[in-house]
Amino acid sequence: MVADYYTASAEFYEMVAARHVRTSAGPLTTALAGVDTTRGPVVEIGAGTGRITEVIARALPGVPIVAAEPSTPMRAMLTSRVFSDPALRDRVTVVAEPAQHLRLPDTVSAVVIFGVVGHLTQRERVRLWAELRERLPRGGPIVVELMGVARARTVPPFRMLRESIGDQTYEWWTRAEQVEGQVMRWHTTWKVLRGGEVVRTTTDSYDWENLSLEQLGEEAGMASSLVSAGGVPGSPEIGRLTR
């Protein structure tokens, strides 16, 4: 069974996604520049609520997109976003399979994988790279997002985000510890405050393997190139893998 890492916090995720897309849209658009869209759809693995789907659609006008999101509540928001936008509704096919079981088109123009690779085992990644590599044209990119953490370590609690909706304030806190090797266990807590008092909290945890772009290139048997380096919290590390 494939774990669903996002159900517990899905109701809050759009606040994270709105901030994330502000720092990732530019690098992703750069990474997709020059893609030959005649070779097939763009496959987005881990589409979340659809913010990145919108970026792909703007960067590559007219190309069909297969947006895969296994988390049911996240996929509900993705489907709502696609359905409410006629420009997306005609182009985006939403599917529920996780990366490990995704049924891929025979050929694809490009692949976008944000917030996913560290959740996969090495065996799962190697299998995925092989399936993608045989479907991509020469020069067709796999655009990947990494955590931007150079090595596994303990991360003390810190606040990642604070937003207000109506009379309530929402805070996103996170911490982490090393589990084994380069695997870190991240613990997140959402606090809902009203009048300065916490009225509700939601917590979840997940494991993430720290990986370098060079490691992914070696696993995939593909060339790797950095598009955008992570730095501050919320700023992603984005790279390209190409045949």
Describe these PLM feature segments.
Residues R103-V111:
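A short acidic, Gly/Pro-enriched loop at the edge of an enzyme's catalytic core
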Residues V149-L211:
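SAM-dependent methyltransferase
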Residues G139-L146:
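Conserved beta-strand signature within the Rossmann-like core of class I S-adenosyl-L-methionine
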Residues V126-R138:
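A short glycine-rich, Lys/Arg-flanked "PGG" loop and its adjoining helix->strand segment in the class I
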Residues G50-H101:
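Class I SAM-dependent methyltransferase SAM/SAH-binding core
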